[in-house]
């Protein structure tokens, strides 16, 4: 099954997954009047802005509890887009972000961010071939104090992910999560009856549940086949 079809099937089937106990408190006036919270928000968007104005005008910012899937073929710029957006959120809006990189190391991501922010040559940055002025410029980069938390745990399971999100939310009140990328996650348990497509669908369902539990948007990068 093509990855595109799998994602569409997941989105259609979210409601059909096992129901959770009803924990709604109907005595809460704000739950009956959700617009009151938005009315108190004086910013242009009631979600987390991406920093890309054309996109934010459509989405009104990434909304709490949303699961956003960004899918594209290999080498189309998914990570570059996610990093650019992360930079905007953490520096321009000072909102804490948790970035889970299952492919690249935290060091590689930091180098890419520094190169993009400073305009320095990426290769020179990696090799340490910098002038004293360039080193001083890096030391004063706004990225050094940005509320960005990178986790590069490989083959991350859903259980591990939830535990890390809970810790980040409690300690740093993160406002958004990025996962790079979906196909490198796992459920943490082996089921011979479940094929790869079913496992991906189950992971997505679990991620949606986590987004709702912690009331924050989760952005998932997903690779699709070049044949799609």
Where are the model-predicted features located?
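The Walker A/P-loop phosphate-binding site
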Residues: 15-120
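C-terminal regions of RecA-like/P-loop NTPase motor modules
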Residues: 158-174, 191, 205-214, 226-228
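Short, contiguous acidic/charged loop-to-helix segments that flank catalytic cores in large enzymes
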Residues: 73, 153, 185-202, 228
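Cytosolic-facing regulatory segments adjacent to core modules
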Residues: 57, 88-173, 187
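Accessory, often N-terminal, substrate/partner-engagement and coupling regions
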Residues: 1-21
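Conserved nucleotide-binding/hydrolysis micro-motifs of P-loop NTPases
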Residues: 75, 104-107, 154-157, 182-185, ...
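Substrate-engagement module of ASCE P-loop NTPases
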Residues: 88-91, 198-220
């Amino acid at each position: 099954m093509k990855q595109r079809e799998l994602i569409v099937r997941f989105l259609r089937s979210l409601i059909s997954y096992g129901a959770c106990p009803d924990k709604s408190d109907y005595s809460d006036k704000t739950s009956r009047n959700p617009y009151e919270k938005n009315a108190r928000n004086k910013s242009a968007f009631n979600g987390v802005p991406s920093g890309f104005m054309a996109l934010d005008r459509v989405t009104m910012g990434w909304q709490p509890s949303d699961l956003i899937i960004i899918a594209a073929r290999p080498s189309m710029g998914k990570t570059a887009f996610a990093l650019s957006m992360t930079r905007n959120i953490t520096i321009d809006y000072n909102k804490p972000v948790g970035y889970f990189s299952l492919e690249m190391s935290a060091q590689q991501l930091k180098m890419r961010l520094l190169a993009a922010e400073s305009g320095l040559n990426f290769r020179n940055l990696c090799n340490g071939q910098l002038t004293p002025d360039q080193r001083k410029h890096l030391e004063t980069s706004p990225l050094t104090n940005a509320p960005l938390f990178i986790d590069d745990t490989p083959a991350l399971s859903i259980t591990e992910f939830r535990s890390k999100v809970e810790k980040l939310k409690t300690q740093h009140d993160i406002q958004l999560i990025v996962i790079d990328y979906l196909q490198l996650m796992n459920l943490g348990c082996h089921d011979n009856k479940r094929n790869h497509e079913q496992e991906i669908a189950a992971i997505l369902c679990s991620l949606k549940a986590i987004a709702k539990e912690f009331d924050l948007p989760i952005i998932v990068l997903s690779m699709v086949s070049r044949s799609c």
